[in-house]
Amino acid sequence: MTWKKFSGEVIHSSILEEVEKAILRETENGYKLKVCIGTDSQVKSSHTDFATVIVLLREHHGGFMYIAQEKSTLKMGIKERMLLEVQKSIETAYSICDLLDIYDVDLEVHAD
């Protein structure tokens, strides 16, 4: 999965390394962080676009995010698509949850 900053800049390191750098930078600047993860999808005529985001919120000071986009040509109903959204969010959360525990950063996974 290719991760990008909201600006479109591609992340060349692993998302785990990028999130750790962000946590260190933001906590050194005095911010308490919270991470929110979610996935949404949009059905097109020939495929479905999925976007998973990792949002780092600075308590009372805005935030920033990383986004990974994927396309699927599989035909699926809304229930299957929603379950796939939840799966992508949970997989992303599992990939960084140990890091968040180390730095005592709260995690929220959106499953809607």
Spans of features found by a protein language model:
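Basic, amphipathic N-terminal segments that precede the first structured/catalytic domain
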Residues: 1-36
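Conserved active-site and cofactor/substrate-binding residues in soluble primary-metabolism enzymes
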Residues: 14, 49, 84-87
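Short helix-terminating capping/connector loops at secondary-structure junctions
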Residues: 28-31, 100-106
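Short charge-dense sequence patches
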Residues: 31-47, 72-84
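Short glycine-rich or small-residue beta-strand-to-loop segments that form or flank ligand, phosphate
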Residues: 36-39, 108-112
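Acidic, metal-ligating active-site segments
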Residues: 37-38, 44-68
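Generic structural motif
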Residues: 65, 70-71, 107-109
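Acidic helix/loop or adjacent segment enriched in Glu/Asp that either coordinates divalent metal
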Residues: 72-102
